From Swiss-Prot:
PANTHER family: UREASE. This is Urease subunit beta. HAMAP family: Urease_beta (MF_01954). It catalyses: urea + 2 H2O + H(+) = hydrogencarbonate + 2 NH4(+). It holds the Pfam family Urease_beta. Heterotrimer of UreA (gamma), UreB (beta) and UreC (alpha) subunits. Three heterotrimers associate to form the active enzyme. Keywords: Cytoplasm, Hydrolase. Pathway: Nitrogen metabolism; urea degradation; CO(2) and NH(3) from urea (urease route): step 1/1.
């Protein structure tokens, strides 16, 4: 093995298997682009994004870690959300939860 070398298993990595998902239509009603990262609590995103927030409670974007989705002004886009794992305790973001879901 060479220092820094990766030894990866064959095949595709399956992420979020068995977790609840939901697809939502999201519209950016603002006049600026809005970008949301992979692990941001979607329920607490910028309020210029219009969607069913109750369905997004406890959910994040179902995209690879470190990725993001960008919403241009006036753009409508369907996104898939996946439930947070672990103990389902969420702090920070817009401080709308700050505790257990």
């Amino acid at each position: 093995m060479i220092p820094g070398e990766y030894q990866l298993a064959d095949g595709d990595v399956q992420a979020n298997v068995g977790r609840k998902t939901v697809k939502l239509e999201v519209v950016n009603s603002g006049d600026r682009p809005i970008q949301v990262g992979s692990h941001y609590h979607f329920f607490e995103t910028n309020h210029a994004l219009k969607f069913d927030r109750l369905q997004a409670r406890g959910m994040r974007l179902n995209v690879p870690s470190g990725n993001a989705v960008r919403f241009e002004p006036g753009e409508a886009k369907e996104v898939e959300l996946v439930e947070f794992g672990g103990n389902k305790v969420i702090y920070g973001f817009h401080n709308e939860i700050d505790g257990k879901l």
